[in-house]
Every structure is written in structure tokens, then in C-alpha cells.
């Protein structure tokens, strides 16, 4: 019953947040394009200069119809063109395929809410393993799934919630297998094959979700091997290593283009270059930590850490706790902190999505640390009071109270502006910057409010001869922000001399302009 109530709360919080935060980023629109379009972004997003595209063109780009439905091969081919693995997009294709020819951002949000329930389950199992208290584990897991960070990731229609869930289950299952291993003399494949297969499948699933998962997998595997080595479980160490190597080989066989993505495409090369460049050892890490602290702990993380540290030192001095008792934190902390550092340095932007896979593990480490200290109390009533206080602190420091919007206001404002402008003109124009057409993805879900879109290459500035374009009384014009608006207005005035132009809204990538024909 408690688990059902927790699940309903998580679902409700995310739905309410989804209703008050709308509009999609370009990457989210790209998730739909990758999941539902034959030919992927190369077939859909590279537009021809001086050509009309009707509303159905953009509507079809984000909906699954005909052969696009339940098409695993299409999704894999689309992602091979891009720089990400295909598993999440396969799931999104399944959802969109059920609703043939329809688009809704709730398809992606609903899928992420489903995965967030697994995040809650994985975090609950992990916490229960350490704290051995169902109420603390359930309440803490629920609060995390209702935090600003978790809601942010749920509403962001990409693969990060799925990556978070797989990371949690992989961590928890490694602990389960390790405990089983040290409780018996040997852990052969023949007798315990199910456990090796489970680790094998989780590893492949994580690698097919996001390449950053492979960084965490290497770290947790190294830690696992070290733990077995210390216990002189050499045969089990070799069996585990064999299972992981087998998973790597099968992974490459299933998705061979991963090697190209990791070592030869721009994302892989740029990640290595950014990690190695001398920009200050901790600059990016501190920036990422600030974002993490703000989104998960509302800026209270350092106060929490200082409090726990001081209590720990006090209890060590009083000989009520030993370093050995704190050792269990190493399994959670070491791979997570190293991942946090590496990805903060290597990721292209300072944004929470890249470190979200280990965010729940770091959150769990704080709770486990606090519970270790609570357990030093002698009397049960003191432990109970301290546990209640811990849950209250987590609630106020992490629970999302809707005071801060998850998505930037301009996503919603832009949609409102476009809807108003569509009343002025039935057609729109996009003037792009050479081949950087990805900058127009953000509005693929909005272009369909117009009857058609006329695409112009803003670098070529070819003569405009299209009669339909030249006959328009008003035009809604998108101009790539890489281009100078005044230069574009001068170019348009050559063919539309009686027009005046007003920039109605500016986004990161486009100026949204209303062009009106002057009377007389």
C-alpha cells in the first residue's frame, strides 16, 4: 500500500509539473525525429533552398506512420547517423507507434514517468540494502523522485531517466552478487548463471542507453574486481571479468557503430579533448556541483555535509563509531565521485543531465551516511526520532514545491507568440545559416500551425522568384541568430520593397519576426 501511494505521488508531481512547464528544446524534438522518421535527421532536417514545405512535412517528422511504426531497424539506423545509442529511442518509437500519426509531448513525458518509477524502485532497493529500514528507504526514494532534479529530467524528453534507472539497478545488483559470492566458497557460472546474465544484460542495456554509462560501468567493475582481489577470490574475479568482457563483445556486435561514435565522431573526440585541456582542474566540477546542489538539495548540500562531517568526527573521538563502519559508503561514493569529476570535465555543457545517472547514488550516500550516525544512538526512541528528523530534512531540502519553473519561460512564451503570429499570416519563412539546420529543430512542433514554410539559405541569398512568397501581405519570418537581421531585412527588401519588419521575440537560435506590407 505504501509503495502504491508513493508511486501515485511521483506520477502526480510530474504530471502537475508537466502541465505548468511546456514547450520543447531542440534536443527533445530531435528525440521524436530520431524515433519516428525514416531517414532520421539527415532525411528530414536538411532542407532545400527556396522551397516550400507544407505543415504535414513537419507534423510527419514527429509522428510515427506506416513503416515507421514499431521499426527497430529504422531507429538503429537513425542513431547510427547521430552520436547516441538507440535504446531510449526504440521505447519512444513504441509509444508513438501505438498512437499512429499523432504527436504529443506527453508520449515522451509519460515514458519518462514510467522510467522514473523504476528509478524510485532501484533507489529503494539500494537504500534498503544499506539502511535496513523500509520507511526511511521508501520515503527517501519518493522524495528523490519528486525533487526538482528528478522532475527536470522527467520533463526532458531524452534518455537520462532510463540511464539513471539502469545505473541504480546495476549498482544494487553488484552488491547483491558480491554478498552472495563471499557467502560461498565458489561462484561458478553453472550454478549462478542467472546472476552473471543479469549483470551482463544490465551492462549492455546501459551501454545502449548512453555512452557515459560505460564510464560508470568501468568504475564499478574496477571496484568490484578490487573487492574480490582483496578477499583473494581470484576465480570469481576471473569469472566476473569474463562476463563483463563478453558483454562488451556482444555490445559491439549488437551496435558496432558505437566504436565510431566513441573514438572517431566529434562527440567522442571533443569529450577527450575537453577533459584533457588545461582550463583549471576543478572549474567545471565546481560549476556542475553548484547545479547539482541547487537542483537536488536547494543549496543546502554543503550545510548537510558539514553537519555530518562534524558529527562523524565527534563520534570517532568518542569511540562510538569506527572508520570500518563508514567503509560501506565507499561502494557508492568512489565510482560516483570519479564519474562526476570525469563527466563534468568532458561533457560539452554544464548541465545536470550529464551527471544525472549518478545523482541518485550520491543522494543515497548522504542518507546512508546519516543513517550510520543515527545507528550509534543507544536507545530506540532516539533512533526513531532522529530518523523522522532525517526524513523531514530531506523533504524540505529536496522535495519540489513548484516554486521554480523546470523549463525556461521562453519555451512557453515562444509558443504563445507563434500562435498569435499565425493569426497574422498563414505562411512562415525560415532563413537559415548554411548547413546548421539543427538550430531550427526547436520549432518543428510549431511550424505546423502554418499552412507552409518557405526555406531560404541565408548565406546564399539567392534571388526570390516564388510567386506565392511574393504575394503575401504578411509573413512570419524566422531568422537564424547567426545571421544579422539588418542584412536579412535588406536582402528581403530587394524582393519585398514595401515591407516593414519587427522582431517580436528572440530565442537562443532564432529571431521571430513579423513582416507586414505597408499600405500605400
Give the ranges of each region predicted by the language model.
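Transmembrane-helix signature of polytopic, membrane-embedded enzymes
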Residues: 123-146
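Membrane-interface alpha helices of multi-pass inner-membrane proteins
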Residues: 140, 188-211, 222, 246
Amino acid at each position: 500500500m505504501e509503495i502504491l501511494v508513493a508511486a501515485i505521488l511521483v506520477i502526480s508531481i510530474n504530471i502537475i509539473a508537466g502541465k505548468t512547464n511546456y514547450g520543447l528544446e531542440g534536443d527533445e524534438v530531435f528525440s521524436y525525429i530520431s524515433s519516428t522518421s525514416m531517414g532520421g535527421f539527415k532525411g528530414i532536417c536538411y532542407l532545400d533552398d527556396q522551397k516550400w514545405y507544407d505543415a504535414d512535412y513537419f507534423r510527419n517528422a514527429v509522428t510515427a506512420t506506416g513503416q515507421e511504426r514499431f521499426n527497430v531497424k529504422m531507429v538503429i539506423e537513425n542513431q547510427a547517423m547521430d552520436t547516441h545509442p538507440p535504446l531510449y529511442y526504440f521505447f519512444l518509437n513504441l509509444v508513438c507507434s501505438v498512437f499512429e500519426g499523432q504527436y504529443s509531448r506527453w508520449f515522451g513525458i509519460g515514458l519518462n514517468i514510467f522510467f522514473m518509477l523504476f528509478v524510485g524502485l532501484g533507489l529503494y532497493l539500494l537504500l534498503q540494502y544499506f539502511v535496513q529500514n523500509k520507511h526511511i528507504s521508501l520515503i527517501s526514494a519518493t522524495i528523490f523522485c519528486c525533487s526538482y532534479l528528478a522532475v527536470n529530467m522527467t520533463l526532458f524528453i531524452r534518455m537520462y531517466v532510463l540511464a539513471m534507472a539502469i545505473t541504480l539497478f546495476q549498482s544494487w545488483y553488484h552488491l547483491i552478487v558480491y554478498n552472495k559470492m563471499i557467502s560461498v566458497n565458489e561462484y561458478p557460472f553453472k550454478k549462478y548463471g542467472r546472476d552473471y546474465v543479469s549483470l551482463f544484460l544490465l551492462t549492455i542495456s546501459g551501454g545502449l542507453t548512453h555512452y557515459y554509462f560505460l564510464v560508470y560501468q568501468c568504475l564499478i567493475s574496477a571496484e568490484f574486481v578490487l573487492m574480490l582481489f582483496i578477499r583473494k577470490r581470484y576465480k570469481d574475479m576471473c569469472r566476473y571479468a569474463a562476463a563483463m568482457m563478453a558483454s562488451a563483445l556482444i555490445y559491439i556486435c549488437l551496435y558496432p557503430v558505437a566504436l565510431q561514435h566513441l573514438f572517431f565522431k566529434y562527440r567522442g573526440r571533443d569529450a577527450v579533448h575537453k577533459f584533457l585541456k588545461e582550463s583549471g582542474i576543478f572549474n567545471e566540477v565546481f560549476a556542475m556541483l553548484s547545479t547539482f546542489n541547487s537542483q537536488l538539495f536547494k543549496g543546502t548540500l554543503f550545510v548537510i555535509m558539514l553537519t555530518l562531517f562534524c558529527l562523524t568526527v565527534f563520534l570517532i573521538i568518542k569511540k562510538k563509531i569506527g572508520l570500518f563502519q563508514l567503509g560501506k559508503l565507499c561502494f557508492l561514493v568512489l565510482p560516483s565521485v570519479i564519474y562526476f569529476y570525469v563527466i563534468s570535465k568532458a561533457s560539452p555543457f554544464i548541465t545536470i543531465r550529464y551527471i544525472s545517472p549518478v545523482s541518485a547514488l550520491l543522494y543515497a550516500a548522504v542518507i546512508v551516511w546519516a543513517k550510520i550516525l543515527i545507528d550509534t544512538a543507544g536507545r530506540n526512541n532516539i533512533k526513531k526520532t532522529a530518523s523522522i528528523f532525517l526524513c523531514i530534512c530531506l523533504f524540505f531540502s529536496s522535495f519540489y514545491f513548484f516554486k521554480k519553473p523546470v523549463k525556461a519561460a521562453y519555451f512557453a512564451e515562444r509558443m504563445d507568440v507563434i500562435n498569435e503570429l499565425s493569426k497574422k499570416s498563414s505562411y512562415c519563412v525560415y532563413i537559415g545559416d548554411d548547413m546548421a539546420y539543427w538550430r531550427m529543430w526547436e520549432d518543428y512542433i510549431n511550424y505546423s500551425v502554418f499552412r507552409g514554410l518557405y526555406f531560404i539559405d541565408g548565406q546564399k541569398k539567392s534571388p526570390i522568384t516564388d510567386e506565392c512568397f511574393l504575394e503575401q501581405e504578411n509573413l512570419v519570418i524566422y531568422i537564424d541568430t547567426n545571421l544579422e537581421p539588418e542584412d536579412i531585412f535588406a536582402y528581403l527588401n530587394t524582393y519585398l520593397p514595401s515591407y516593414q519588419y519587427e522582431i517580436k521575440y528572440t530565442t537562443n537560435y532564432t529571431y521571430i519576426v513579423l513582416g507586414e506590407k505597408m499600405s500605400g
